[in-house]
């Protein structure tokens, strides 16, 4: 007896489902992972979205919730599983998984615990998607991007840390608030570590090509009567402030990651401040990953823009590298 489906549909092609060409996987379905997932869905960047996590009930609930909204989305397939086979043939894998920092825990201890988590995650990702591009979001992101590069065996251009893409967005937002100009018209970069030693490149801050330093040479320094230096301090402190108020950060990093994904999936060649290997640049001679302005397209991170930095900015970048190397050099089991 024929089923309703058989009576309704006459098949013309035996292979009804085409293989996805822009499959995106999110590893970790916590607040950040789900913000990344929703941002990717709303920007219509994937023809298949896969979620993976060790928390089975949480994972099942999140994927059901997204699937129930399928009518309002243009991503035909949303899947989830604890088993990494669900991630097979991903074009991009976004890693948000890891362990949270405990009260009083040293940064090195936190990193080492996350190394142990990544030793499980990364080989599984590469096993099922050997040609993928990996975007690392878990913190401390620069060190864990280095860890991912070491564990994956993938070339540098396919390992990207979300880095200071969000820090730079915060920077531009705060500049826009001071000037009354939209953030998209306020240009400036935060480089280096995604964290306390990040570098505000005041020499490059401009609106419509007009350098703010040309108008006020002391901008961003202690001698600045307008206290623009406070803008960078707010960038550094902003995550702590949001966490204090709501317990975590998720939406802005989700939007930031989706923009990085978009530059890759749409082969845009846009410049993003993201974390990459910087050995040999700006006098840095250690294997650290830091954020520099990078070109992202369909092949991944294809080039770095050689930004003209002032001597004090180069010094700050080198200090950022030293801070990360101080932790990185003591990591075990890589």
Swiss-Prot record:
Q: Which reaction does it catalyse?
A: (S)-lactate + NAD(+) = pyruvate + NADH + H(+)
Recite the UniProt keywords alphabetically: Cytoplasm, NAD, Oxidoreductase
Where does the source fall among the domains of life?
Answer: Eukaryota
* Any Gene Ontology biological process: pyruvate metabolic process
- A single cellular component GO annotation: mitochondrion
Indicate where this protein resides in the cell: Cytoplasm
Q: Which residues bind substrate?
A: 107, 139, 170, 249
Give a yes or no for keyword Metal-binding in this entry: no
Q: What is its main location?
A: cytoplasm
User: In this UniProt entry, which cysteines form S-S bonds?
Assistant: none
Q: Which residues bind NAD(+)?
A: 30-58, 139
Enzyme Commission number(s) from the entry: 1.1.1.27
Q: In which pathway does it act?
A: Fermentation; pyruvate fermentation to lactate; (S)-lactate from pyruvate: step 1/1
Family of the protein in this entry: Belongs to the LDH/MDH superfamily. LDH family.
Oligomeric state and partners? Homotetramer.
Q: What does this protein do?
A: Interconverts simultaneously and stereospecifically pyruvate and lactate with concomitant interconversion of NADH and NAD(+).
Descriptive protein name:
L-lactate dehydrogenase B chain
Organism from which the protein derives:
Xenopus laevis (African clawed frog)
